[in-house]
Amino acid sequence: MVLSQNLFYLKITTKMIPSRTYQAHQSRLTMVLFVLEMEWMLSTGQDKLFTWHCSETGERLGNYRTTACASCLQFDVETRHVFVGDYSGQVTILKLEQDNCSLITTFKGHTAGVTTLCWDPVQRLLFSGSSDHSIIMWDIGGRKGTALELQGHNDKIQSISYAHHSRQLISCSADGSIVVWNMDVERQETPEWLDSDSCQKCDQPFFWNFKQMWDSKKIGLRQHHCRKCGKAVCGKCSSKRSTIPLMGFEFEVRVCDSCYDTITDDQRAPTASFHDSKHNIIHVNFDPTRVWLLTSGTDKVLKLWDMTPVVS
């Protein structure tokens, strides 16, 4: 842009000129992230490698081999931690130095591949979306190992963004649904499912418990689990369905009859709003300054959404 005689002249170039080529992977790339503060180029690929290069010289600084094909990544500038999600459903946390890295830990919570990650450096929260239709919030800053599960989609999660000023999470799935989650509420962790050979409510044997079936002369039943208490129950003792928004269940799920009676109407109040983008979403970009959401779909259409009515 040139300033002359109080007029602005904008020169528009329609040609991009490549300046450097990085020989980073031996297979298809899945994610590239440029870290301006470090002048690093981070990348993941289907060759199960995470690599980082110096953007100034093009030199490879290091790499790390993941257990499965990496699919997404995020980076924390302050601590130099990188979060790598892969198709096995786990998130690997690495500490990067100038020319080496060290494994910190791995998060395992999804039953299918991790498709997207979102990192909030202010509250130190990591959000992971997966092909299992779920989102998990990992509270790293709290240092208590808290992991909150969010269930509000019927297809794989394509993208997630976090508006830390209003503490709202925006998630989009392949079926076109956009969900805005209120994270400024006191949520509860989902309980672990308990193992038992018989119903923990009526003591009826499950179908693999041959000894109790023979002793009681009763036919074995199928095992289910209450989403509120985690107990192993039979179908008769878990005939009720209910939403449990504070546990992340915005859709009705199976609960045992005794837990159903303890859920109040206030506890069933939704903590998320649902919207239809009317196209199958591939990728999303959220602008928190203007509160705009850009979605791209398989229909070759870009849609720009004004999110001010739903994002405070």
PLM features: residue spans?
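Cys/His-rich Zn2+-binding "zinc-finger" mini-domains, especially FYVE domains
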Residues: 184-258, 262-267, 277
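Short C-terminal beta-strands that terminate individual repeats in beta-propeller domains
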Residues: 10-11, 18-24, 44, 60-66, ...
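Structural hallmark of WD40 beta-propellers
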Residues: 18-20, 38-42, 51, 60-62, ...
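Canonical WD40 repeat/beta-propeller blade segments in eukaryotic WD-repeat proteins
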Residues: 27-34, 63-75, 112-119, 155-162, ...
